[in-house]
């Protein structure tokens, strides 16, 4: 720390010169005072300014001091400005520079100090720039992640990575995984909507739906999967195409009756003969006919309470195991042509062969029920099944019995929890109660061999038929 140094030269500005003279004159007199007191000496100062004005200082009396001066004849020290400058140079001090006593204390700005301060400023700027580079902004995109739940249940979920992403982006699932998914599309169906006979009700507004955390169109909507809860792993094998937007595309897919290749434990009430016959009809059906009807799944659960946790499926999870598909139920699908202006591609052969076996009353009742329950289900995307590997058994020729063809069985009463999709269609217009349906269960006749064989055929060792009564849960 030191005073601000000024160069000892004549001050050109008169005002500044006057101020400097006043300050330094007082300073000089102050120093003389200190010297006289400290060292017990006599001091006399005689000063004339630039205007020849006299200023004097004497420690005791000026005249007394001047008298001594005139009478003193011994050699003494006498200095001038040049002598002072020379003495300062010898001591290593710059005679041209002198500290300003009137200036305030301040830091000396030498070239070395300025370089030091400049280097410090550069280091601070570098640290600030590094901190800005390290602060990476959050990403503004979504990365859909397709996660299969297990090896058998490949449901597609989309997980947005960033919370600041665009909510309008649609998750793009992998095509192969999407073909293995159980749902042909996402339906906007609230969980409170009732299940109308296992048919998907609601509107399919878009093929993929809005992006959500669970991969569905709306977190509050049902996934609307046409999956029987008991045969969830079996229905995976029936691949479905990627979802399409029926509102923007006039081409409509074909109707397929989904029959998963289940064992006797999972489908105890459907015979292997029926599986073979349905497999042949599905493979031989024409795929060019336009359909807009929901998929009818004949898969049944093994346990009433077994299902997809938390989400209501298209088929109610309270189905019992006593469920069989009768030929009248399959033939009742022909009512789609008249009631809803639809075509059955996979049941066409059954209509041509066995339509004459159905009475007009049953067809009219099924047609009225179909028009009632399928009025809101005309815009649904439908999966088309591929060829299914089903164990084949010899088919027995159908018998000509017309005892009670109009009364097809309802294996569960109206108050029971287990109902099949086709049973729900049939029971909406049926006037028979549970006791009437149970009375005619043993007398039912199927045109395509869906009924139980007669007692003489049942005991025949050459014909292998699975009994419909096996595995029924009472």
UniProtKB/Swiss-Prot annotation:
Q: Where is the MADS-box domain?
A: 3-57
What the record says about disrupting the gene is: Mice show impairment in hippocampal-dependent learning and also increase in the number of excitatory synapses and potentiation of basal and evoked synaptic transmission. Mice surviving to adulthood manifest smaller, apparently less mature neurons and smaller whole brain size, with resultant aberrant electrophysiology and behavior. Mice exhibit thrombocytopenia and a defect in B-lymphopoiesis.
Q: Residues bearing Phosphoserine?
A: 59, 98, 106, 110, 222, 228, 240, 396, 420, 446
Role description:
Transcription activator which binds specifically to the MEF2 element present in the regulatory regions of many muscle-specific genes. Controls cardiac morphogenesis and myogenesis, and is also involved in vascular development. Enhances transcriptional activation mediated by SOX18. May also be involved in neurogenesis and in the development of cortical architecture. Isoforms that lack the repressor domain are more active than isoform 1.
Segments of this protein annotated with the region Disordered: 91-118, 375-474
Covalent cross-link site, Glycyl lysine isopeptide (Lys-Gly) (interchain with G-Cter in SUMO): 391
**Ranges annotated as biased composition (Basic and acidic residues):** 434-444
Note the InterPro entries from the entry. Answer: HJURP_C (IPR022102), MEF2-like_N (IPR033896), TF_MADSbox (IPR002100), TF_MADSbox_sf (IPR036879)
Q: What residues are annotated to bind DNA?
A: 58-86
Q: Subunit details for this protein?
A: Forms a complex with class II HDACs in undifferentiating cells. On myogenic differentiation, HDACs are released into the cytoplasm allowing MEF2s to interact with other proteins for activation. Interacts with EP300 in differentiating cells; the interaction acetylates MEF2C leading to increased DNA binding and activation. Interacts with HDAC7 and CARM1. Interacts with HDAC4, HDAC7 AND HDAC9; the interaction with HDACs represses transcriptional activity. Interacts with LPIN1. Interacts with MYOCD. Interacts with AKAP13.
What is the recorded name of this protein? Myocyte-specific enhancer factor 2C
What's the domain remark here? The beta domain, missing in a number of isoforms, is required for enhancement of transcriptional activity.
Its subcellular locations are: Nucleus; Cytoplasm, Sarcoplasm
Locate the transmembrane regions by residue number. Answer: none
**Per the record, where are the segments of Polar residues compositional bias?**
375-390
Phosphothreonine: modified positions: 293, 300
Tissue-wise expression: Widely expressed though mainly restricted to skeletal and cardiac muscle, brain, neurons and lymphocytes. Beta domain-lacking isoforms are the most predominantly expressed in all tissues including skeletal and cardiac muscle and brain. Only brain expresses all isoforms. Expression occurs primarily in the internal granule cell layer of the olfactory bulb, cortex, thalamus, hippocampus and cerebellum. Low levels in the cerebellum and hindbrain. Expressed throughout the cortex, including the frontal and entorhinal cortex, dentate gyrus, and basolateral amygdala.
Region Beta domain: start and end of each range? 271-278
Task: State the SMART domains in the record.
Answer: MADS (SM00432)
């Amino acid at each position: 720390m030191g005073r601000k140094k000024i160069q000892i030269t004549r001050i050109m500005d008169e005002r500044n010169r006057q101020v400097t003279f006043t300050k330094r004159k007082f300073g000089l007199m102050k120093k003389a005072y200190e010297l006289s007191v400290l060292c017990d000496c006599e001091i006399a100062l005689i000063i004339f300014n630039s205007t020849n004005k006299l200023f004097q200082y004497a420690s005791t009396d000026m005249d007394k001091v001047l008298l001594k001066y005139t009478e003193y004849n011994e050699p003494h020290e006498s200095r001038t400005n040049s002598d002072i400058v020379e003495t300062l140079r010898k001591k290593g001090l710059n005679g041209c520079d002198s500290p300003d006593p009137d200036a305030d204390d301040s830091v000396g700005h030498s070239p070395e100090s300025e370089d030091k301060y400049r280097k410090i400023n550069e280091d601070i700027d570098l640290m600030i720039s590094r901190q800005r580079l390290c602060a990476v902004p959050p990403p503004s995109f979504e990365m859909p992640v397709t996660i299969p739940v297990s090896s058998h249940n490949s449901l597609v979920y989309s997980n947005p990575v960033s919370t600041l992403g665009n909510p309008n982006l649609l998750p793009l699932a992998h095509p192969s995984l999407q073909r293995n998914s159980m749902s042909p599309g996402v339906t906007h169906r609230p969980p409170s909507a009732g299940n109308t006979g296992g048919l998907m009700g609601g509107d399919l507004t878009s093929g993929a739906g809005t992006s959500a955390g669970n991969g569905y169109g709306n977190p509050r909507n049902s996934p609307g999967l046409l999956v029987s809860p008991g045969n969830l792993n079996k229905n995976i094998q029936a691949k479905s195409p990627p979802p399409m937007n029926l509102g923007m595309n006039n081409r409509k897919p074909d109707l397929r009756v989904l029959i998963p290749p289940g064992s006797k434990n999972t489908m105890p009430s459907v015979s292997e003969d029926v599986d073979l016959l349905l497999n042949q009809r599905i493979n031989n059906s024409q795929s060019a006919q336009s359909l807009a009807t929901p998929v009818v799944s004949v898969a049944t659960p093994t346990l009433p309470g077994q299902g997809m946790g938390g989400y209501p499926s298209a088929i109610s999870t309270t189905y019992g195991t006593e469920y069989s598909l009768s030929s009248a139920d399959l033939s009742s699908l022909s009512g789609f042509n008249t009631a809803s202006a639809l075509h059955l591609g996979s049941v066409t052969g059954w209509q041509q062969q066995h339509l004459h076996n159905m009475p007009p009353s049953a067809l009219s009742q099924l047609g009225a029920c179909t028009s009632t329950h399928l009025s809101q289900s005309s815009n649904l995307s439908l999966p088309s099944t591929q060829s299914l590997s089903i164990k084949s058994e010899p088919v027995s020729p159908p018998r000509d019995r017309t005892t009670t063809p109009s009364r097809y069985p309802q294996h569960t009463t109206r108050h029971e929890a287990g109902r099949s999709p086709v049973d729900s269609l049939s029971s909406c217009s049926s006037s028979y109660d549970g006791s009437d349906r149970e009375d005619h269960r043993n007398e039912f006749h199927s045109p395509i061999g869906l009924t139980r064989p007669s007692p003489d055929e049942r005991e025949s060792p050459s014909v292998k038929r699975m009994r419909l009564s096996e595995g029924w849960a009472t």
